[in-house]
Amino acid sequence: MSQISRDEVAHLARLARLALTEDELDGFAGQLDAILGHVSQIQSVDVTGVEPTDNPLKDVNVTRPDTVQPCLTQDEALAAAPKAADGRFAVPRILGEPE
C-alpha cells in the first residue's frame, strides 16, 4: 500500500521551492514510499527491555579557546554578495508569499 502520493510529493516540492518534472514527481513518490516503508519496519521492532541510549561518546562541551582571530571587514564580506543594501546582504523576500 502506498504511503505517499504523487500529490503529496508535489506539495512538499512546492513548500521546499523545488521545481520537479512529472517524471521526478513519480520517481520521488516511489523513493519516499520505500523510505517510509523502511521507517515503518524499524518502528515495528519490539524494543521491550532494551535500555534507551543516547550518544555513547560522552564528550560534553568540547570547545576551543575563545580568542580573537582576524576576520573579514563588513565591506569585504559584502563585496562577495550578489546584492547589498545599507550595509547588509539583500535577499529576495519570502515571507508572505503564497506556497
Swiss-Prot record:
It comes from the Bacteria. Pfam families: GatC (PF02686). GO terms for biological process: glutaminyl-tRNAGln biosynthesis via transamidation; regulation of translational fidelity; translation. SUPFAM superfamilies: Glu-tRNAGln amidotransferase C subunit. It catalyses: L-glutamyl-tRNA(Gln) + L-glutamine + ATP + H2O = L-glutaminyl-tRNA(Gln) + L-glutamate + ADP + phosphate + H(+); L-aspartyl-tRNA(Asn) + L-glutamine + ATP + H2O = L-asparaginyl-tRNA(Asn) + L-glutamate + ADP + phosphate + 2 H(+). It is an enzyme of class 6 (ligase). Coiled coil: none annotated. GO terms for molecular function: asparaginyl-tRNA synthase (glutamine-hydrolyzing) activity; ATP binding; glutaminyl-tRNA synthase (glutamine-hydrolyzing) activity. Its EC number is 6.3.5.-. Keywords: ATP-binding, Ligase, Nucleotide-binding, Protein biosynthesis. Belongs to the GatC family. Heterotrimer of A, B and C subunits. Allows the formation of correctly charged Asn-tRNA(Asn) or Gln-tRNA(Gln) through the transamidation of misacylated Asp-tRNA(Asn) or Glu-tRNA(Gln) in organisms which lack either or both of asparaginyl-tRNA or glutaminyl-tRNA synthetases. The reaction takes place in the presence of glutamine and ATP through an activated phospho-Asp-tRNA(Asn) or phospho-Glu-tRNA(Gln). NCBIfam families: gatC. PANTHER family: GLUTAMYL-TRNA(GLN) AMIDOTRANSFERASE SUBUNIT C, MITOCHONDRIAL. This is Aspartyl/glutamyl-tRNA(Asn/Gln) amidotransferase subunit C. It comes from Mycolicibacterium smegmatis (strain ATCC 700084 / mc(2)155) (Mycobacterium smegmatis). The gene is gatC.
